[in-house]
């Protein structure tokens, strides 16, 4: 939880340092959509970044990159490149589309939408829903991984050998159990957060 709060604080700092900022909720059309609030609900189109920070976040906005940090996060818009999300519960809705990679760190992650490249997830629980479409791989560090029998995962599913896994035999994908290097069963969130920190520094 401390690591998640640290990443959330960095998101907020970056938002404060960028000049084109919108402190409100509603529909927007701008180079960047950037919102800090307790409750965030956005629609519209950004020609650049979508950066949202709050307690409860609902993003139906479209943009090039998504940077989202909150407690409850729901994404139903279209991200044309990569999405970086930190939260307690993160849901990619059925209408949500990530056209490149999804990086997510949360206690619970639910994917019902489309990811057109890879998913990098660090979470206590990951659910790939019945409407999910993942064109690339799933790289997971999680205690529990569930893939619905009607989900589409075209790449490789990678998880720790200690993970509690439910993957239907009919799923057309490769499944790889990665050997655990340490002896703890704690979820390691360092890898995904490292990716988030790296992008923010750049």
Annotate the PLM regions:
Residues 1-202:
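Intrinsically disordered, low-complexity terminal regions
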């Amino acid at each position: 939880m401390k690591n998640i709060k640290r990443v959330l604080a960095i998101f907020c700092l970056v938002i404060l340092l960028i000049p084109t900022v919108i402190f409100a909720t509603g529909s927007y059309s701008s180079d960047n959509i950037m919102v800090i609030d307790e409750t965030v609900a956005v629609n519209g189109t950004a020609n650049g970044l979508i950066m949202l920070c709050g307690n409860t976040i609902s993003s139906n906005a479209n943009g090039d990159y998504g940077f989202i940090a909150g407690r409850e996060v729901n994404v139903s818009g279209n991200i044309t490149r990569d999405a970086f999300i930190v939260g307690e519960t993160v849901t990619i809705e059925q209408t949500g589309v990530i056209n490149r990679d999804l990086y997510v760190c949360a206690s619970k992650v639910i994917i019902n939408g489309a990811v057109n490249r890879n998913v990098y997830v660090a979470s206590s629980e990951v659910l790939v829903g019945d409407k999910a479409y993942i064109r690339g791989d799933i790289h997971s560090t999680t205690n529990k991984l569930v893939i619905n029998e009607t989900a589409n995962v075209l790449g490789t599913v990678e998880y720790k050998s200690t993970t509690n896994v439910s993957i239907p035999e009919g799923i057309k994908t490769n499944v790889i159990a990665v050997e655990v290097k340490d002896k703890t069963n704690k979820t390691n969130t360092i890898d995904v957060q490292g990716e988030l920190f790296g992008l923010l520094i750049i």
